[in-house]
Amino acid sequence: MDKIREKLSNLKLEAESWQEKYEELKEKNKDLEQENVEKENQIKSLTVKNQQLEDEIEKLEAGLSDSKQTEQDNVEKENQIKSLTVKNHQLEEEIEKLEAELAESKQLSEDSHHLQSNNDNFSKKNQQLEEDLEESDTKLKETTEKLRESDLKADQLERRVAALEEQREEWERKNEELTVKYEDAKKELDEIAASLENL
């Protein structure tokens, strides 16, 4: 019984710890989900910008092949292409970074759900142990009541045996008294019979 109570107490403490962690992660997960939405929107926006830059780069590169363009125009367009290429590369890096952060956030969200599952399992185990403990308490009370009834019956039997022993001792005493009286009466009769014979 004490072991069950101790195990139940430990599980309650562990369940409370899991619950606290779950509440913390739940709040953090809520923030992460909001961040995920914002990052997904940023990724979409950056992807659109990236596509626009690529389209502009293609147009500029196509313009370079036009023989009618002056050399100065070509130089300017090449510089624009380089600048746009750098921006495009920066956008791609930012998109990759946001995607990595998004993946990490989703993993944390999954961990939060896993923690909730663990918390539910502990709650079920805790409930089962409480039911087992309640059942054990009921059985213990029933056993204690039966033992009490047995003790009462034993006391009654002991008193009955003691009373019977007293009755037996009383009958033995009376029997001894009757035996003595019988012997005395027999002796007296023998003496009377002897006196009659002498007459």
Curated annotation (Swiss-Prot):
Cross-link (Glycyl lysine isopeptide (Lys-Gly) (interchain with G-Cter in ubiquitin)): K39, K59, K187
Residue runs in coiled coils: 1-199
Region ranges (Disordered): 59-81, 102-147
Example of a GO cellular component annotation carried by this entry: cellular bud neck contractile ring
Keyword Endoplasmic reticulum assigned: no
Biased composition (Polar residues): 115-126
Subcellular location: Cytoplasm, Cytoskeleton
BP term (GO), one: mitotic cytokinesis
Keywords: Coiled coil, Cytoplasm, Cytoskeleton, Isopeptide bond, Phosphoprotein, Repeat, Ubl conjugation
Description of how the protein assembles with itself and partners: Homodimer.
Notes on the domains: The molecule is in a coiled coil structure that is formed by 2 polypeptide chains. The sequence exhibits a prominent seven-residues periodicity.
The protein, known as: Tropomyosin-1
Organism (species): Saccharomyces cerevisiae (strain ATCC 204508 / S288c)
